[in-house]
Amino acid sequence: RTGWAKLPNGRHIYNTGMQVIGDAGGIEVKLSDTLPQLELTDRCTEMEDKQVLQSYLRKLSREPDILILLVAHMVRSLLASMFERLGFPLRYILYLVGVQGSGKTTAANDFGLPFTDVTQNAPAPATRALSSKPAVRDFAAEYRDMSALLDDVCTSSSAETRRISTDIAAYTLRFAADRIYEAISRPGGGQRKVRCTAGLVITGEFPMQKPSDLTRCVIVEVDHQMRGKEADDRMVSSATATRFIKYLAEHFDSVSDEIRMALSNFRADAVEEGGPRQQQHMGELSCSFQLLLEYARSIGAIDDLEMAEWRLRLQNALGRALSANMCLTAKFERENVSNVAKIIVDAMKSET
């Protein structure tokens, strides 16, 4: 599988599918040729770690409410197996919702998908909206410890297309967030059970409409044309991810301890607003982005004052996402109550 592996000598390495990132300590690591053909490239080799991170953070400051959450989710997905081992499985989908042409897909590719599919020379893992539930299941279960994009899941074309896409999106949410195991056929016969192991990002033009679906999402509203794209966005993003993964591999146990301490002190059920489930999502995203900030500070890319400024930006981004989710949940709950009331009134009229 892609993702983290512990070697017999106690070291941890990250497998992209085609590469091993991290010091194996002299152990030869062979990768199966059946793995996804993904790689992570660092084309900023002439830049020091500090310079790469400073460039990266400057780019995030263009659209902090959107890009911070994409990056936090990318880090959360990279460390999915570590979080799960600590008792925090990934139980949400990051949903970028906004009008067509606002830059959702470009942002997701540049800042949420640092890997490249070498067979297509394209950001990966990513696919256009899938037309069947088995296709979604197979895609979401193929990748481990990385974010993956399902693009244009909910688009507003015909009413029938919208109904089908909403149904598939709802299935995707439950397959990912509820940790559902499903049986698939083996090539040689028999079956095996799979579940979602990727950190899914989906894009769409309209939000989910059931409160139970919304609680499985972290909503990122893209309500304007995103600005300031630069030609080297993806190059710097991939270089940052490469160096950050090397740092994580070297400090794997201490990072695990940081996550355990951060989330053991975080009590989602002690927070009144947004419900425990949403608060848990936000707590995990906050922890993930702060791991990146700690790395940036450790290499001198930011100082304590800048660290505090970035934490404030993070807080604002999380607050905006939580507010969007709460507003949508309240809206659809009101509509559901109104619809039920109308049905009761109509039924009473028909009896008289």
Model-derived features: where do they sit?
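N-terminal pre-Walker A segment at the start of P-loop NTPase domains
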Residues: 62-82
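Extended alpha-helical interface modules used as scaffolds for assembling large macromolecular complexes
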Residues: 1, 5-13, 18-23, 132-136, ...
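Phosphate-binding P-loop
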Residues: 81-91
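AAA+/P-loop NTPase substrate/partner-engagement loops
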Residues: 97, 106-162
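Extended, charged/polar low-complexity intrinsically disordered regions
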Residues: 1-60, 325
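Structural recognition of the conserved hydrophobic beta-strand(s) that form the central parallel beta-sheet
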Residues: 149-151, 182-183, 194-205, 219-221
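The conserved Walker
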Residues: 100
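Glycine- and acidic
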Residues: 35-39, 49-65, 89-97, 151-158, ...
